[in-house]
Amino acid sequence: MAKAPNNAAAARVRKKVKKNVAEGIAHIHASFNNTIITITDRQGNALSWATSGGAGFKGSRKSTPFAAQVAAEAAGKVAIECGIKNLEVRIKGPGPGRESSVRALNNLGIKITQIQDVTPVPHNGCRPPKRRRI
């Protein structure tokens, strides 16, 4: 005999709570292969995020400044819906999407209050991988 459908599963689905935050931090991780943009509030809780690969770019096109720009626009639009007006930008990594992603956030109308470079630099720690020979 078949059981009646359980409505408890439908009751567990919650509506997404919309946060209203005026200031936040944009973490931009620009590697040589991809660019990841995460916009958080001051406490570090993620409001929105986007990547070059998630924006539809694959392979070597992910590592272009244009792909980083598209990803930054996608993350910025969701952040604006959360009420973000001012952003502090923290850039990590040597990738080609560093500058273009900051410009894209600025062009969306978000005021950028501070730009920090938080790229980790070793104080002569681990030995780096050997040079690539082509």
Swiss-Prot record:
Sorted UniProt keywords: Ribonucleoprotein, Ribosomal protein, RNA-binding, rRNA-binding
Functional summary from the UniProt entry: Located on the platform of the 30S subunit, it bridges several disparate RNA helices of the 16S rRNA. Forms part of the Shine-Dalgarno cleft in the 70S ribosome.
PROSITE patterns: RIBOSOMAL_S11
Molecular-function GO term, any one: structural constituent of ribosome
Stated name of the protein: Small ribosomal subunit protein uS11
GO CC terms in record: ribonucleoprotein complex; ribosome
GO terms (BP aspect): translation
Organism of provenance: Herminiimonas arsenicoxydans
Disulfide bond found in the keyword field: no
InterPro entries: Ribosomal_uS11, Ribosomal_uS11_bac-type, Ribosomal_uS11_CS, Ribosomal_uS11_sf
Superkingdom of origin: Bacteria
Similarity comment: family membership: Belongs to the universal ribosomal protein uS11 family.
Quaternary organization: Part of the 30S ribosomal subunit. Interacts with proteins S7 and S18. Binds to IF-3.
Alphabetical list of PANTHER family matching this protein: 40S RIBOSOMAL PROTEIN S14/30S RIBOSOMAL PROTEIN S11
SUPFAM superfamilies in the cross-refs: Translational machinery components
